[in-house]
Each structure stands twice: as C-alpha cells, then as structure tokens.
Swiss-Prot record:
Region: LID, residue numbers: 122-159
Pathway: Purine metabolism; AMP biosynthesis via salvage pathway; AMP from ADP: step 1/1
InterPro entries reported for this sequence: Adenyl_kin_sub, Adenylat/UMP-CMP_kin, Adenylat_kinase_CS, Adenylate_kinase_lid-dom, P-loop_NTPase
Main location: cytoplasm
An example Gene Ontology CC term for this record: cytoplasm
Protein name (record): Adenylate kinase
Main function: Catalyzes the reversible transfer of the terminal phosphate group between ATP and AMP. Plays an important role in cellular energy homeostasis and in adenine nucleotide metabolism.
Species per Swiss-Prot/TrEMBL record: Polaromonas naphthalenivorans (strain CJ2)
Known EC number: 2.7.4.3
Molecular function GO labels: adenylate kinase activity; ATP binding
Pfam family name, one: ADK
Amino acid sequence: MKLILLGAPGAGKGTQATFICQKYGIPQISTGDMLRAAVKAGTPLGIEAKKVMDSGGLVSDDLIINLVKERIAQPDCAQGFLFDGFPRTIPQADAMKAAGVKIDYVLEIDVPFEAIIERMSGRRSHSASGRTYHVKYNPPKVEGLDDVTGEPLIQREDDKEETVAKRLEVYSAQTRPLVAYYSDWATEAPDEAPKYRAISGTGTVEEITERAFKALSN
C-alpha cells in the first residue's frame, strides 16, 4: 500500500495516518522527519540539506525527491508507505511523477474550513500537565479552568483563529490544487495514475477510520 494522504491542517490526517499505518504495516513518512533523519545520519543528501537549512534557505524540490527515493528504498518500505504532508505543491507532484515514484492511492480527508476553524480554535490546554479540552466538544467543568488543579487554561498560538485561518489560506493556495491534480489524472489515465479517493472527515474518529479503510479496499 503506497499512499498519499491529503487534507487541510486540522482535518485529522495525523490520527488517520496512525490507524492506516498500523493496519497495513507501513511507515508514515513526513518530509520533516525524513530531512532530520538524513541530516542526523550524515548521508550525502543529508549534508547537502543541512547546508541549505543552516543558511536559512528552503530545501529544493529536487533534493526532497532524491531524499524520498532514498527513504522509500529502505527495508521498512517493502510493503509500502504513507506520505503525510508530501507532495505539498504541484511542482513536487510533477517531480515525483517524473522520478517514477509509484503510488497506489491518494486519499483526501475532506473537512469544511468552518468546521476546522471551530475544531482548532476551540482547543484549550493546561500547560503544566498537557491536559487538553475543547470549549464545545470536551469543556472543562468550570469554564477556562483545569479540572484537576483549577489553574487557568491557555489557547496555544497555533490554535488561535487567525493562525488557523492563515494556515488554511496557505493550504488553499499551495496544496489544495493537488486534489484536482490527482483526481483529473485518475480520470484521464486510470491505468497509470494512483486511485483517487475522497472521504468526509467529519464525525467520530471511528466513523472516519471506517470510511478510510473502505475507500482503500476498492
């Protein structure tokens, strides 16, 4: 099972990736982890990437694709792999196609942006313990206070509505076009393109997992 998982930030990709990887016995590959591992291992590509990152530059798509090819050739990818957050742009998808990286499925987890904003901006946490709450779905007993200590809860910078909206804007501009890219390719060249599947990402975690497994079995 060679899979690309698509979806906006906050759509629940991380949760579903864990279940999919467990079911199929495949590793989850994110470009961030891959870059860090290559830099740590001191591979030629890792050394090259480190130079770019140390100078504050962005790692080129060519370098990322070469790292991807190196990573998926490792033994733990024999049964397949799941790409999370890659490709992020059309040029990366084109480069992956040109490099002959074969993918079986592209699975999109589709959640309306309003639902994502509500889901993320409603999160609150107790910094000392890491306990998390949600103002609507899992509220504390007393508004704004931790159930155990009674200390004030905070809203992380990442969860503030304007931060979430900004991330969704970047996703709309850069990554959302991949939905059309893969669905069009699947329609035009079904024999060589990955199978494209979209599922709704609203509902319980169990419902979404069930939809994901069903989509990947046909």
